[in-house]
Amino acid sequence: ARLDRVKNMTGPVEISGKKARLRELANPVIVAGDHGKESKDRDEAEEQGGFKKMYSLIDDYKFKGHIRLISAQMNRVRNGELYQYICDTKGAFVQPAYEAFRLDCDRVHEVRSAKDRDLPWRPCEIIADGVSGLHIDPYHSDKDADILVNFFDKCNADPSYWDEISQGGQRIYEKYTWKLYSERLMTLTGAYGFWNYVSKLERGDTRYIDMFYALEYP
C-alpha cells in the first residue's frame, strides 16, 4: 500500500508503540511505500510525509530492532513469501484502510495466516469476526490494540486457536476466490446473452400485437 494519510500505514506502529503488552507479543512488519522514490508530485510528496511520520514514530517509541519496514512489493512471488512468513511465525495480517480487499483475502488464505481487517469500508461477510479473522477499525487505536493483544494472548495460551482462526478462512476459499467469481460471471453472461437473443425473437411479434392494440384502443 501507499504510505500516505488515507492508507494509515503508520497506524499499526502507533498502536504497537502505545500498547506495551502488544510490543511484547509481536513486532510490526510494515510493507508500504516506495523507499527509493523522490518526486515533487503532490501524491509522492504526501508519501514522503508518511515516511517522515513513520520514522518519527520509530524514534519516539524506540522501535529500532523491533520493526521491519519493507518497500511495497510488485513481485507476486515475493508478496507470497511475505504472507508465508506471517503464517510460519503464527502472526496476523492487518489490512490497510481503503485497500482492495478480496485479492488480499485470496492470497492470505493460500498461506493460511490469521487475518485482521479494517471494519467500516469492506464487506463484513467476507471475514466473519472471531471465526475467520477479526474486525478492527484502523482509526481507533486503543480498541484495536486490545483486540490484537487478546488474540495473541489466546494464541499463546492455546496454540490451536491460531489454527482454528486460520482454518476458518476456508469459507473465503469456498465463496470468494477469483475462480468462483469468473465462473459465476461467465454463467451470468451466458444467461444474459440467451435472454437478449430470445427478446429479439419476440420483439417483432410484440410490436405486431401492440399495433392492433393501438388501433382498437386509440
Curated annotation (Swiss-Prot):
Record EC number: 2.4.1.13
InterPro entries: Sucrose_synthase_pln/cyn
Top-rank EC class of the record's enzyme: transferase
GO molecular function: sucrose synthase activity
Statement: the UniProt record of this protein carries the keyword Repeat: no
Annotated gene: SUS1
Function: Sucrose-cleaving enzyme that provides UDP-glucose and fructose for various metabolic pathways.
Family: Belongs to the glycosyltransferase 1 family. Plant sucrose synthase subfamily.
Catalysis performed (reactions): an NDP-alpha-D-glucose + D-fructose = a ribonucleoside 5'-diphosphate + sucrose + H(+)
Protein name: Sucrose synthase
Swiss-Prot/TrEMBL GO biological process terms: sucrose metabolic process
Key words of the record: Glycosyltransferase, Transferase
Lineage: Eukaryota, Viridiplantae, Streptophyta, Embryophyta, Tracheophyta
Gene3D superfamilies for this protein: Glycogen Phosphorylase B
